[in-house]
């Protein structure tokens, strides 16, 4: 394990920029569907005859290409959007069919019902299960027994992938992420849209200079609920006022925040951000896994970032998923235990034992944190407590 004290906390930089693609953004929908399908398949394997997570990866999900026209108070569906679940997935175990098309379809439909609630499967959106079993490894995706799933007993790093995570969130990151979360009601078992006239394809962008944070939020209104341009502008003004108050509360005096909502919707050549069903997949936009938020729910250009997207990857052995979650857990634990900002970097050579990672780097700010021995012991203890796939079988909507 390597420990260094060379990190400059991002909140100490003169400029900081952070972005979040909301839950209804095409890329975020693709990430979420991929993860939902992977976890549904993993649970089915663990609860069924295999008793272990079988080989699969569905980290190439595609969504988009719909066509809906909209106008004040109405819309017309011309072509449904499509969800294409690309990847590979074990189709049978010991000769018994696992029903993977049903698993893919039902998992995607459940996810869409939460985060794209105005879409109707079979009407405005179509789900195409497309996972194959193509490989040059005999029985890899049609195992006759767990002897054909060697990683079930001896998990090894499936790839040489570097994953990095950070804690805590900076004040800017906190405002940007939580501002989009504020458009949802989190009081139940699953989140629900807070406003019935607001779509889910939201983007929040923050630019901080010194302690001044400018936030731009792009928030779609649903066309069926908008009677006119004047009504649109009035609703946007109300949303802007409400989000400004939420941003001020989130900043808690640490930043001076200015919030704009849909700034292109007034003046000459204005453009309204108005959608029929709440996501730009309805107007030709497309989303694929790995183009959006990192595991922490943000796009942070000024922080090191994992090159692997974890969404849809096998939770039993894929380094790009396991190390991403483990790095974030370690960063959170170090911050919670010692009250210091840190970055955690993890990697292992392909084929080496998955846990613990072969290479661990903990980076702290100069002069901060415990001694190297105490920190090493703590990190090793936390790594030993990490369970695969058990700690990765819950889809976390909120960080």
Specify the residue positions occupied by each region the protein language model found.
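N-terminal, Lys/Arg- and Ser/Thr-rich interaction peptides
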Residues: 1-18, 142-156, 210-219, 292-306
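N-terminal, positively charged regions that mediate nucleic acid binding
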Residues: 1-53
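Short, hydrophobic beta-strand segments
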Residues: 18-20, 81-88, 213-226, 307-313, ...
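Glycine-rich, N-terminal phosphate-binding loop and its surrounding beta-alpha-beta segment
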Residues: 43, 47-122
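A short, glycine/Asx- and small/polar-enriched loop/turn
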Residues: 77, 209-213, 267-271, 353-359
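Glycine-rich, mobile lid/loop segments that gate access to catalytic sites or pores
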Residues: 106-247, 251-252, 257-265
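Long, well-ordered mid-to-C-terminal structural blocks that present hydrophobic/aromatic surfaces
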Residues: 237-304, 313-336
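Internal helix-turn-beta structural module
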Residues: 335-399
